[in-house]
Amino acid sequence: MVVGDFPIETDTLVIGAGPGGYVAAIRAAQLGQKVTVVEKATLGGVCLNVGCIPSKALINAGHRYENAKHSDDMGITAENVTVDFTKVQEWKASVVNKLTGGVAGLLKGNKVDVVKGEAYFVDSNSVRVMDENSAQTYTFKNAIIATGSRPIELPNFKYSERVLNSTGALALKEIPKKLVVIGGGYIGTELGTAYANFGTELVILEGGDEILPGFEKQMSSLVTRRLKKKGNVEIHTNAMAKGVEERPDGVTVTFEVKGEEKTVDADYVLITVGRRPNTDELGLEQVGIEMTDRGIVKTDKQCRTNVPNIYAIGDIIEGPPLAHKASYEGKIAAEAIAGEPAEIDYLGIPAVVFSEPELASVGYTEAQAKEEGLDIVAAKFPFAANGRALSLNETDGFMKLITRKEDGLVIGAQIAGASASDMISELSLAIEGGMTAEDIAMTIHAHPTLGEITMEAAEVAIGSPIHIVK
């Protein structure tokens, strides 16, 4: 401790105010804790400021532009449809600003103290918080680390004005004429699709056999087909990016496919090959917190580290880097600190891709269930047999419901189709609530809605489908 530096005491110190940190702080405050949040950048973290929210705003804008140009089959013809990309970016920023202001209001309303700066552990009960002009020591009874992650930088692709990470891609001032995306996961596919809808010529380089490798092949193949149908998208699988040559007006990317070296010229190259946990500048070694070789913090089922009063949540612990996973873990950690018997259960946590069509998955896939030796029923229902999907002109896709054969218990679901991101929540509820396929089939769903697809898939699972022939 620096001479003259009087420490400020708090019950629970939260490091990071992203979707995990600010939720943890609010829940801890609700449970009677005096809470302090330390945030080095902007409230809301990556998700709200340079991730989930702005990317979905950009995707929505691109989708609307695409629809305006291609609704001839409905009798709608629009001429001279144009994009003012400056206004698109201004609108996107307004969405973000409303939400960051909302987070600030929620923290204030719950009497959470917010401190700007970077926290560094001194010991297991104190941190040093530093900003540009000062430093202050904070002591705590418990701490929750929620510092998130950052994009991985490839050795031969150093970030610059032309070599972008996801943050840079969201901040472009112009619509690229041509964009190369390295990595066909959910981030690359979402951002690539958004720009392709604005008219950008898109080239995706994916190292695996399929884009979106975390999803079943039948699902990712639907997305691949829709992308290629646009006419301005190339997808190279089993491709290895080798290097980039930058010019003032663009880049030349070198890559290899099946031993053959190729090049492609573009305005920009976007790198989306994963994210790295932000655990390397916190002084975790000062308190002996155990981590993996990848910098992932080891935790138990209450998000507690090996140091009993220090917890970790979100992208810095095991599991997919999902905002809603971090928020869930934040609540669990706050409740554990308060002495409540809360434990994490990841089976009901969904994963979503805002592609075309959207993809969503929760619980077991058919392959995973079979690998574990489970006796299951995998029931499918197509979007093309649903009235609402037809009226929306969104007939690509299907729902697959995974149930346990012995009792019909819902243990998983996959959706490829319009509004899959909204539909998956009912299946998460089914898993969390221990519901059976019969429970869903007997639940009255409004007509005509996409939600009926869930009911229809459940009817298939119990052997009594109405709108498809057995």
From Swiss-Prot:
A single GO molecular function term of this UniProt record: NAD(P)H dehydrogenase (quinone) activity
Record flagged with keyword Oxidoreductase: yes
Keyword tRNA processing: no
Keywords: Cytoplasm, Disulfide bond, FAD, Flavoprotein, NAD, Oxidoreductase, Redox-active center
Cofactor(s) needed: FAD
The protein's assembly and partners: Homodimer. Component of two multienzyme complexes: pyruvate dehydrogenase complex and oxoglutarate dehydrogenase complex.
EC number(s) given by UniProt: 1.8.1.4
Name the UniProt record assigns to this protein: Dihydrolipoyl dehydrogenase
Extra information: The active site is a redox-active disulfide bond.
Ligand binding (NAD(+)): G183, G184, G185, Y186, I187, E206, T272, V273, G274, R275
Annotated catalytic residues: H447 (proton acceptor)
Homology family: Belongs to the class-I pyridine nucleotide-disulfide oxidoreductase family.
Entry binding sites for FAD: E39, K40, A41, T42, L43, G44, G45, V46, C47, K56, A119, D315, A323
Cysteine pairings via disulfide bonds: C47-C52
Role: Catalyzes the oxidation of dihydrolipoamide to lipoamide.
One Pfam assignment: Pyr_redox_2
Catalytic activity: N(6)-[(R)-dihydrolipoyl]-L-lysyl-[protein] + NAD(+) = N(6)-[(R)-lipoyl]-L-lysyl-[protein] + NADH + H(+)
Cofactor note (record): Binds 1 FAD per subunit.
PROSITE patterns with a match to the protein in the record: PYRIDINE_REDOX_1
GO cellular component: cytoplasm
Places the protein is found: Cytoplasm
Native organism: Bacillus subtilis (strain 168)
InterPro entries linked to this entry: Class-I_Pyr_Nuc-Dis_Oxidored, FAD/NAD-bd_sf, FAD/NAD-binding_dom, FAD/NAD-linked_Rdtase_dimer_sf, Lipoamide_DH, Pyr_nuc-diS_OxRdtase, Pyr_nucl-diS_OxRdtase_dimer, Pyr_OxRdtase_I_AS
